[in-house]
């Protein structure tokens, strides 16, 4: 196991002083004993801060909503899982037998969670400077490729990317009413998001427009956007 972890450390570009932290970061909740969920929680907070700080300095003219959307792109599960696959993190995960048999070492959510846990472990091992250095090294190429133009997406796409970055279910849209004559209808849509206790609402001349309005309202309710971006 020790030699195996040596290889992973070389891929990560970081050598742990406390190897137990590394092992814990690679331990899924399906495995007996302690698991990486607390480290994942810590790593998620550190990742969001470091990327937010980097974007703040990298895009001095970008608005708050733009910065939030750019950050969501960088910290979403898909991006983290891609990193994990590049480092072959799945080969080093400790999984319960059921999760192992079902291919958990390939699952996007498990890989993304492990990357966040590793960030948390690095922070506890040698501090914030080390965690920041590794995050920027890992995500630097994606960061340099971003432009504020990348935020010019419709509200439904922005909401979906934000929720995916938090590991949440996708929003659900429901047409609750249609008013007016066939040639001049108004659609009323509810948007249900797991992170919100109340549904948001939108209306417009088509179902698509109504869904976009409801999604925009959800982004404001979540505090991701202020309604003026």
From Swiss-Prot:
Cofactors: Mg(2+)
Active site: 44, 116
Descriptive protein name: Ribonuclease 3
Record-level Gene Ontology MF annotations: double-stranded RNA binding; metal ion binding; ribonuclease III activity; rRNA binding
Major location (coarse): cytoplasm
SMART domains listed in its UniProt record: DSRM, RIBOc
Subunit: Homodimer.
EC number(s) on file: 3.1.26.3
A cellular component term, taken from the record's GO annotations: cytosol
Record: residues binding Mg(2+): 40, 113, 116
Known role: Digests double-stranded RNA. Involved in the processing of primary rRNA transcript to yield the immediate precursors to the large and small rRNAs (23S and 16S). Processes some mRNAs, and tRNAs when they are encoded in the rRNA operon. Processes pre-crRNA and tracrRNA of type II CRISPR loci if present in the organism.
Keyword Cytoplasm carried by entry: yes
Gene Ontology biological-process annotations: mRNA processing; regulation of gene expression; RNA processing; rRNA processing; tRNA processing
Domain DRBM positions: 154-224
tRNA processing in keyword set: yes
Residue ranges of the TM segments: none
Protein localization: Cytoplasm
SUPFAM superfamilies with a match to the protein in the record: dsRNA-binding domain-like, RNase III domain-like
Organism: Pseudomonas aeruginosa (strain ATCC 15692 / DSM 22644 / CIP 104116 / JCM 14847 / LMG 12228 / 1C / PRS 101 / PAO1)
